[in-house]
């Protein structure tokens, strides 16, 4: 029995594993590759130079691999690459990259992308990320592993969301969120360390304590950003479970181009 509904349109050149399931009225473009056991919901459109891994579930009416919403785009063969075991719910839009960046949009593994999410051109979404319903990622946004973005939130282009961080619902984010930090509001402001999330992911009490100390240096002690970075480096060399996560935090802060939320 065919796993492709008779009303679906599969353009010549598309490469589909024989176990892929395609729902009614879905369209798969000529330059699309889809891996084993992936399911495509009814009325979805998978187009562009798009590669999708294994065991993904793409919901009804999703638009995956569409042209970037960038007025400079001139039909260059830019790409979208999606990993494995992702859930991409109904009405989500994910666009290919642009040549002004690296020419590719990426989505890692084991992500939970809820309904009506937008992932713009050149975004880099890590693994084990949750993007809640109606979260909107502008172009060039980077989201680290295990980050959570609340529903109805808007993220400005080129913003970075650090690993294990959390952005509350209905927030407007215009600068970077450091790893491990909770942020919320319009505009988004810091609200502490994501303690519960870190506990769930097996971070030790010592590591969480070190991150809390790092947060105080960054946000609570009245230090300038430059002075805070010096003390964060000292904290990262203290010895113990907290060294690596604190080092990741200060590296992120030092590499920020848009500045961090303060």
UniProtKB/Swiss-Prot annotation:
Q: Where in the cell is it found?
A: Cytoplasm
What family does the Swiss-Prot or TrEMBL record give for this protein?
A: Belongs to the transferase hexapeptide repeat family. LpxA subfamily.
Pfam families documented for this protein = Acetyltransf_11, Hexapep
The name this protein carries in UniProt is Acyl-[acyl-carrier-protein]--UDP-N-acetylglucosamine O-acyltransferase
Specify where it is mainly localized. Answer: cytoplasm
Q: What is its EC number?
A: 2.3.1.129
Sorted alphabetically, the keyword list is: Acyltransferase, Cytoplasm, Lipid A biosynthesis, Lipid biosynthesis, Lipid metabolism, Repeat, Transferase
Q: How does it assemble?
A: Homotrimer.
Known pathway: Glycolipid biosynthesis; lipid IV(A) biosynthesis; lipid IV(A) from (3R)-3-hydroxytetradecanoyl-[acyl-carrier-protein] and UDP-N-acetyl-alpha-D-glucosamine: step 1/6
SUPFAM superfamilies (UniProt xref): Trimeric LpxA-like enzymes
Give the UniProt entry's GO cellular component terms: cytoplasm; membrane
The record's HAMAP family line, in alphabetical order, gives:
LpxA (MF_00387)
Q: What PANTHER family does the entry give?
A: ACYL-[ACYL-CARRIER-PROTEIN]--UDP-N-ACETYLGLUCOSAMINE O-ACYLTRANSFERASE, ACYL-[ACYL-CARRIER-PROTEIN]--UDP-N-ACETYLGLUCOSAMINE O-ACYLTRANSFERASE, MITOCHONDRIAL-RELATED
Instruction: Give the originating organism.
Output: Paraburkholderia phymatum (strain DSM 17167 / CIP 108236 / LMG 21445 / STM815)
Identify a single GO molecular function assigned to this protein. acyl-[acyl-carrier-protein]-UDP-N-acetylglucosamine O-acyltransferase activity
Q: Tell me the Gene Ontology biological-process terms attached to this UniProt entry.
A: lipid A biosynthetic process
Say what the protein does.
Answer: Involved in the biosynthesis of lipid A, a phosphorylated glycolipid that anchors the lipopolysaccharide to the outer membrane of the cell.
Reactions catalysed according to its record: a (3R)-hydroxyacyl-[ACP] + UDP-N-acetyl-alpha-D-glucosamine = a UDP-3-O-[(3R)-3-hydroxyacyl]-N-acetyl-alpha-D-glucosamine + holo-[ACP]
């Amino acid at each position: 029995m065919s796993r492709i509904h008779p009303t679906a349109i599969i353009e010549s050149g598309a490469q589909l594993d024989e176990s892929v399931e395609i729902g009614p009225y879905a369209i798969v473009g000529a330059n699309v590759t889809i891996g084993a056991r992936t399911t495509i919901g009814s009325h979805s459109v998978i187009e562009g130079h798009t590669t999708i891994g294994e065991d993904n579930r793409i919901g009804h009416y999703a638009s995956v691999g569409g042209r970037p919403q960038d007025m400079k785009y001139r039909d260059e063969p830019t790409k979208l690459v999606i990993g494995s075991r992702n859930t991409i719910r109904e009405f989500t839009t994910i666009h290919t990259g642009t040549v002004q960046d690296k020419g590719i949009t990426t989505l890692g593994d084991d992500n939970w992308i809820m309904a009506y999410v937008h992932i713009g051109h050149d975004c880099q979404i890590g693994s084990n990320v949750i993007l809640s319903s109606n979260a909107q990622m502008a172009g060039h946004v980077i989201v680290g592993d295990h980050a959570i973005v609340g529903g109805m939130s808007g993220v400005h282009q080129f913003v970075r969301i650090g690993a294990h961080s959390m952005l509350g619902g209905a927030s407007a984010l215009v600068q970077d969120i450091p790893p491990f930090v909770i942020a919320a509001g319009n505009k988004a402001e810091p609200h502490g360390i994501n303690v519960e999330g870190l506990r769930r992911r097996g971070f030790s009490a010592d590591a969480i304590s070190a991150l809390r100390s790092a947060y105080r240096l960054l946000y609570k002690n009245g230090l300038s950003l430059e002075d805070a970075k010096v003390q964060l480096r000292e904290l990262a060399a203290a010895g113990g479970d907290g060294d690596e996560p604190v080092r990741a935090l200060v590296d992120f802060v030092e590499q920020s181009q848009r500045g961090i939320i303060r």
